[in-house]
Amino acid sequence: MLDGELNRWFLDPLLRGTYPHDVLERHAPNAPPVRDGDMALITAPIDFLGVNYYQRRVVAGTADGGWRTVHQDDSQHTDMGWEVSPDGLRDLLVRLHDDYAPPPIVITENGAAFGDA
């Protein structure tokens, strides 16, 4: 569900022309209305897809249908507690390519917080 709310909620309408059904069902009472003409505007061609990436997030489901972050003890972490996982950006870019075949991708933000910087 977290993937739907943080990723697919934004990418699916832009690159597929529809909102993810699982997220819509979960949030139906609070979902914004989609009016005539909205999807035509949302799916207008874009020159590039900007990606802001700082860390991967490993999660597990909870009994109430929510999620919790699973701390990766065997990984290096920044001073802010973010896991250092260089493969995460690569995995994201591969997923975007495989799932969406987007226009050119521009890494618009990334980085980490360390005490010496």
Where are these predicted regions, by residue range?
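Active-site region of glycoside hydrolase catalytic domains
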Residues: 1-117
